[in-house]
Amino acid sequence: MARRRRHRGPRRPRPPGPTGAVPTAQSQVTSTPNSEPAVRSAPAAAPPPPPAGGPPPSCSLLLRQWLHVPESASDDDDDDDWPDSPPPEPAPEARPTAAAPRPRPPPPGVGPGGGADPSHPPSRPFRLPPRLALRLRVTAEHLARLRLRRAGGEGAPEPPATPATPATPATPATPARVRFSPHVRVRHLVVWASAARLARRGSWARERADRARFRRRVAEAEAVIGPCLGPEARARALARGAGPANSV
């Protein structure tokens, strides 16, 4: 037979202890009937009064240690108390908001006054590669000739007259003869494959093919007409023409 469980009502709330009740050596434990033991402690000591201008009394001890309490103005060190102290620094002047432009250093080779700097050697002038310089010179000469041709020669600047060099009597009047060197140098030229291919397929190749085709056709015609031009063929033709059928 199962034992019936005794029903208990809701638990009564625990009575709050007195404010500031902290168990100390002078605390006493008392118990009352139908109640839990209560702790009766001695009245807590009053906290020390906060310093003037300090944190409020509601702050905890840990928070009081980290709070900064400003001191009075009389506690500050005054410069007048120190005879050897330097004079106070003047207040900084108001600076403009926009930064002043920095002076740029002169380029290398230029002195402070704008002239050439004797201590710095002059830089080497820029020179074009030989191929580009030659192309530029040829182009300039070609454009000058075109300009003179279009202008018709009017107003064109005359070329400067070159002073004639007097012929020295030591110079022989006969022209110099060409002398061939006994040493021959062979230099291999490099050509493009496309240029060589075009040279092989040029006009001379076409003419050679035409000549070969003409010889072949002449040989074929000679093989057909050749037997008719021989002496035997001529005699047969004359005998056939002298017959009675052909007589008038």
UniProtKB/Swiss-Prot annotation:
Its main location: host cell. Residues 1-129, 149-174 are annotated as: Disordered. The keyword Ion transport does not apply. GO terms for cellular component: host cell cytoplasm; host cell nucleolus; virion component. It is found in: Host cytoplasm; Host nucleus; Host nucleus, Host nucleolus; Virion. Residues 73-83 have a biased composition (Acidic residues). Residues 1-14 have a biased composition (Basic residues). Residues 164-174 have a biased composition (Low complexity). Residues 175-188 are annotated as: Binding to PP1CA. Keywords: Host cytoplasm, Host nucleus, Host-virus interaction, Inhibition of host autophagy by virus, Inhibition of host innate immune response by virus, Inhibition of host interferon signaling pathway by virus, Inhibition of host IRF3 by virus, Inhibition of host RLR pathway by virus, Interferon antiviral system evasion, Modulation of host PP1 activity by virus, Repeat, Viral immunoevasion, Virion, Virulence. Sequence repeats lie at residues 161-163, 164-166, 167-169, 170-172, 173-175. Residues 190-248 are annotated as: Important for interferon resistance. Residues 161-175 are annotated as: 5 X 3 AA tandem repeats of A-T-P. GO terms for molecular function: protein serine/threonine phosphatase inhibitor activity. The keyword Acetylation does not apply. Residues 1-16 are annotated as: Required for nucleolar localization. A motif (Bipartite nuclear localization signal) lies at residues 200-218. ICP34.5 is detected as early as 3 hpi prior to viral replication but reaches maximal levels late in infection. ICP34.5 gene is therefore classified as gamma-1 or leaky late gene. The phosphatase activity of the ICP34.5-PP1 complex toward EIF2S1 is specifically inhibited by Salubrinal, which inhibits viral replication. The triplet repeats region may play a role in modulating virus egress. Belongs to the PPP1R15 family. Interacts with host PPP1CA; this interaction forms a high-molecular-weight complex that dephosphorylates EIF2S1/eIF-2alpha. Interacts with host EIF2S1/eIF-2alpha; this interaction is crucial for the specific dephosphorylation of EIF2S1/eIF-2alpha by PPP1CA. Binds to proliferating cell nuclear antigen (PCNA), which may release host cells from growth arrest and facilitate viral replication. Interacts (via N-terminus) with host C1QBP; this interaction allows C1QBP to be recruited to the inner nuclear membrane by ICP34.5. Interacts with host PRKCA. Interacts with protein UL31. Inhibits the establishment of the immune response and of the integrated stress response (ISR) in the infected cell. Plays essential roles in viral nuclear egress to mediate capsid transit across the nuclear membrane. Facilitates nuclear egress cooperatively with host C1QBP and protein kinase C/PKC to induce lamin A/C phosphorylation and subsequent reorganization. In turn, lamina disassembles and nuclear egress occurs. This is Neurovirulence factor ICP34.5. The gene is ICP34.5.
